[in-house]
């Protein structure tokens, strides 16, 4: 279910009525995507079908959803890079740096339509995002692990953000489980999972619980999730990557892939590499992605590059 007809109660709480997602919505295709992703193997060939130059500075892109003919991408504009401490200070390995979070809306030609500034102070790093048929869910965190985050929902029709809750850890990606009306987050490097419950009025009921009591360990290690989408049936699809070295001082090899994760167990139920790279060697799953069904397979959108980005479109046939 999704939220509509919301009445503002406080800065971070809302009372909402619930209705079913509209027929034919992007969320409604999730089960088809799930079934087809589970048929992907290393033998399935992804073929490039389009490259769309993005006509504005994308800074450092993070998450993406596609709604109709428009794309919504989160990005972090780094103004002062973080600096590592010689040793931990207050539990942190680096300072906060300075920056600005963005939610970009652009069309299928790569032209910027809207730029929503998002975040607050040192909380300027948006992460992976999800669309539930009504709202885009956006986590914004400090640019360092074990920090803090603000969770927003954005109305794509107005490009206005509403704060939902705050949490005492770095939340780098979020999905809305509309079957159970719960939110699920991943942390820095996706090493931890969180599950937040909501009451009948859409208010998060366990945001003030100590993170140590809520977190679950991610037992999948071959990639770090960068962006995730809810598929329905208590499953989410995540994309990500990891870097590997055959020698300590040798070159690094970046491998990306997809994982379908069971949100009841927090365990992957299907894993597959995506063996596609940019000319510079970045895996396509480096950061934002979106997947949708085609007549006989899947279409995937990737935007791995910073600043001067290209939207890469691939298709795969599922036999």
Residue positions per predicted region:
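Short, conserved, GDST-rich strand-edge loop motifs in beta-rich repeat architectures
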Residues: 74-98, 141-145, 240-255, 311-318
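Loop/turn-rich, solvent-exposed surfaces of beta-rich toroidal or solenoidal domains
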Residues: 220-267
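Short loop/turn segments that connect beta-strands within beta-propeller blades
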Residues: 106-110, 154-159, 198-202, 263-266
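Short coil/turn segments that connect the beta-strands within blades of beta-propeller domains
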Residues: 68-69, 133-134, 179-181, 233-235, ...
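Repeated scaffold domains used in trafficking and secretory/extracellular systems
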Residues: 59-63, 121-128, 168-178, 220-229, ...
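Beta-strand-rich domains and repeat architectures in extracellular enzymes and scaffolds
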Residues: 50-92, 125-127
């Amino acid at each position: 279910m999704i939220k509509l007809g919301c009445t503002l109660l406080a800065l971070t709480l809302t009372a909402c009525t619930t209705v079913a997602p509209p027929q034919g919505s992007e969320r409604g295709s999730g089960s088809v995507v799930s079934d087809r992703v589970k048929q992907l193997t290393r033998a399935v060939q992804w073929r490039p079908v389009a490259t769309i130059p993005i006509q504005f500075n994308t800074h450092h892109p993070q998450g993406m959803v596609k709604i109709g003919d428009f794309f919504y991408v989160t990005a972090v504009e780094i103004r002062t890079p973080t600096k590592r401490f010689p040793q931990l200070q207050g539990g942190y390995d680096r300072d906060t740096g300075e920056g600005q979070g963005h939610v970009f809306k652009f069309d299928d030609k790569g032209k910027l339509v809207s730029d929503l500034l998002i975040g607050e102070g040192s909380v300027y790093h948006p992460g992976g995002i999800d669309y539930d048929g009504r709202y885009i869910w956006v986590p914004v965190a400090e640019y360092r692990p074990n920090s803090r985050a603000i969770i927003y929902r954005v109305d794509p029709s107005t490009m206005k953000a509403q704060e939902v809750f705050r949490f005492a850890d770095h939340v780098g990606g979020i999905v809305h489980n509309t079957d159970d009306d719960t939110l699920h987050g991943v942390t820095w490097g996706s090493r931890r999972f969180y599950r937040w419950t909501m009451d009948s009025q859409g208010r998060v009921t366990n945001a003030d619980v100590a993170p140590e009591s809520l977190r679950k360990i991610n037992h999948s290690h071959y990639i770090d999730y960068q962006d995730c989408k809810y598929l329905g049936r208590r499953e989410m699809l995540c994309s990500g990557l990891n870097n590997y070295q055959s020698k300590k001082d040798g070159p690094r090899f970046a491998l990306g892939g997809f994982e379908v994760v069971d949100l009841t167990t927090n365990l992957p139920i299907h894993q597959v590499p995506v063996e596609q790279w940019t000319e510079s060697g970045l895996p396509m799953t480096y950061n934002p992605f979106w997947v949708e069904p085609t007549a006989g397979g899947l279409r995937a959108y990737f935007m791995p590059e910073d600043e001067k980005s290209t939207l890469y479109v691939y298709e795969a046939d599922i036999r």
